[in-house]
Design a protein with these regions (language model features):
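C-terminal, active-site-flanking charged/polar segments
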Residues: 196-202
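Conserved, mostly hydrophobic/aromatic
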Residues: 25, 190, 201
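Exposed boundary/loop context
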Residues: 172-173, 194
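Active-site entrance/lid segments in N-terminal catalytic domains of soluble metabolic enzymes
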Residues: 1-172, 185
Length: 202
């Protein structure tokens, strides 16, 4: 991965070149350097990066919840506005469930105690999932859990529907598919199974 200075340089370059075109950055969970993850989130918030792709997370972390919750408010019509969006990339159902659920109360409480978020942000966060959208990562060219797309995507879609009904979110979470999407035929197969989008990397 890039160091913080390199990330900041990339942010400034894209800000100048992209204008009003939206873009996002990656956030990879770093088990060995948790402070680097926190510093990266602070950097993103300072530069008003509103979209991140969260990958390699096995559990939700304080910096990740902080990014999602910071700045939540209601508009004049009473709608909940969440400026910071997370697209989670996961291959395990138990991890997907965490991202498709509201932020954990324990982590929200810690953020309030540290005065990193307000009580109002905490209250509104309970009505939103951690992830705006979620990519089901099947067997891919890089780091992988060797999950078969044919069973992984339908499982994630069913889980999304179950949690949407449980929590009554104001918008449905989009579920995409990544891993092995290398030809037009494989992309078409993903869409025919119900994927909202496809992700093609390596």
């Amino acid at each position: 991965g890039l160091c913080l200075n390199e990330i900041e340089t990339a942010i400034c370059t894209l800000d100048q070149r992209m204008g009003s075109i939206p873009f996002g950055f990656n956030l990879i969970h770093n088990l060995n350097e948790p402070e680097l993850e926190a510093q990266t989130v602070q950097l993103y918030l300072r530069h008003k990066i509103r979209l991140i792709s969260a990958s390699a997370f096995m559990d939700l972390t304080l910096p990740l919840v902080y990014f999602r919750v910071k700045g939540i408010h209601r508009d004049p019509e009473g709608n909940i506005i969440c400026p910071n969006k997370i697209i989670a990339k996961v291959s395990r159902v138990e991890v997907a469930k965490k991202f498709l659920s509201p932020p954990p109360e324990k982590l929200l409480g810690q953020l309030v105690e540290k005065k990193m978020i307000t009580q109002e942000e905490t209250n509104l966060a309970r009505y939103l999932p951690m992830a705006e959208d979620l990519t089901a990562e099947a067997d891919s060219g890089g780091h992988t859990d060797n999950r078969p797309a044919l069973s992984l995507l339908p499982t994630m879609l069913a889980l999304r529907d179950k949690l949407n009904e449980k929590y009554g979110y104001q918008r449905s979470i989009c579920i995409g598919l990544g891993g092995g999407i290398a030809t037009p035929e494989s992309a078409a197969a993903a869409f025919s199974m119900g994927a909202a989008y496809v992700l093609s990397g390596s």
